[in-house]
Each structure stands twice: as structure tokens, then as C-alpha cells.
């Protein structure tokens, strides 16, 4: 799938070595269903890697990344069901930025792991603490925009993203107005301090 030539046995030995010397680290090995698309291939995957990890799984490929259609054009991908097998649904307000954000290798903080192009930068971990980013004006403005306008009107990166439709466990759409009022109150309180 990745079309990279490697020494397969050395690759597995490196994973086994890491697993045997992991200390407090948890080793989670996973692949995608498009790479092991038969029962036989899945069985082989579990047999080859099952004894060198704490967790192992075959996850579904879902069309959430920019350029997805071009990358997976040769694969038969289910575009009706989400990551966990449930039916996809329209999500107006993405829940993910309300409980997580990403610090990229260069220190830039973005609101989502799907934003590979870093169009939603809300801080910089080189000069701000995680708490400062989380409580910062840029992040708060992004969240308030999401609540007011929904993901398709809030930001370009969110407009083309399908991640919440395929994997959102939380549905905050019915509570948008209530959450927005709370954010406005918190913002007013911070401004008076």
C-alpha cells in the first residue's frame, strides 16, 4: 500500500525489540482495512503482530483527509458508514476542538489532526504554554465561530473536512446556542479581570 521496500523481518524485529523494552509505553499496532482486505490477510496481520503489542486492530479507512479521493482511488471504500461502522451523519458543529487540539512538530498549535495544511493555527508552543493556547483569544474566537456559524461557515479547513461526519462520538449541535452563551460569559469575565 505504501509502496516502500523494507526488510520485513528486520521491521518486525524492531517492533518486537521496542515492545520488549517499552517500560511504561503502550504499544498499539494498527492497520487499515484497505491494506488487509480479506479475512486471510487480516488473520495473517493478527498472527504476525499480535504477540508484540498491547493492542492491535484493523481500522476502517474513512474519507476525511484533503486529497483522499486521489490517494484511495484504487480502493473500494465504504463512504456510507463511519469509523466505527455507524451511519455517517451531517455534523454542523465539530466537537473535536472543544476537547483537544494538536501541537505540530514545529510547535504550531492547530485545532485538529485533520488540518495537515495548518490553516487553523491558534497558538505556538514555542512561546506559549498549553494552558495559554487553550485559554487564548485565538482559540476562543475559533470555538465561538464554530458555535455561531457551524463548521462549514467557520473556516476553510473545516468546510472541506469530513472527519466529524465519520467519527464524531459527541453531538453538540443541539447545544450550540447554550455553549455559545457560556463562552460569551467566560469571555466577559476574562476581559474584566
Model-predicted segments: where are they?
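Short, positively charged
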Residues: 71-85, 137-138
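Short, small/polar residue-rich loop motifs at catalytic or cofactor-binding pockets
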Residues: 95-97
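Flexible mid-to-C-terminal extensions adjoining Fe-S/redox cofactors in radical SAM and related proteins
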Residues: 108-109, 114-193
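Nucleotide-sugar-dependent
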Residues: 8, 90-92
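Radical SAM/AdoMet-radical enzyme domain recognition
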Residues: 1-59
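Short, acidic, Ser/Thr-enriched surface-loop or helix-capping motifs
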Residues: 103-104
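Short hydrophobic/aromatic beta-strand element in the GNAT-like acyltransferase core
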Residues: 100
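Flexible glycine/acidic-rich beta-alpha junction loops that bind and position SAM and/or redox cofactors
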Residues: 35-37, 57-78, 116
